[in-house]
Amino acid sequence: AFDISIVALDKVWLFDGSMTTMPSEEVIKRSVEKVGYQHIRLDSAASTIFLELPGMKIGFGSIGKGYAADRGREIMKAKGIEAGIVNASGDLSAWGSPPQDDAWKVGVNNPFKAHRMVKVLRLNEMAVATSGSYEKYAEINGKRYSHIINPKTGWPSVGLASVTVSGPSAEFANFLS
């Protein structure tokens, strides 16, 4: 499940190739205690956000790319650009169609075979986002740990190598993937 406050775990798991040992159960447990969107208080009148738990953090990195792609699409459409794709680090937001075709063709990578596709999507006024454990991970003692963290347990997700979601919004597709 998506939780904007999962940023409290950003120092527990490192997915930049530098992590060589497992974090302790205690470190994970202490970090998970700082996660929970239900502890975020929004005050619209004062334009403030209050984080109830000490050490709690929020971050938009996980959905920010989709949001940026959607905003880019909206700006270009408002400027009269009739067709295009905004690619925000793999989160795509498309409108119109390319010359001499009726849809944008976007390949979905095969997580088990490099440089191979499992599907080609045809996009018009659509967005697509993919999240997967096959490109960004930590390898410890020969085992790969996904960068997709379960906010309730603090542990990397297991069982899915890749999830691709298409829909009208890259932000929402990213959220679901």
Predicted regions and their residues:
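Mature catalytic core of soluble alpha/beta enzymes
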Residues: 1-177
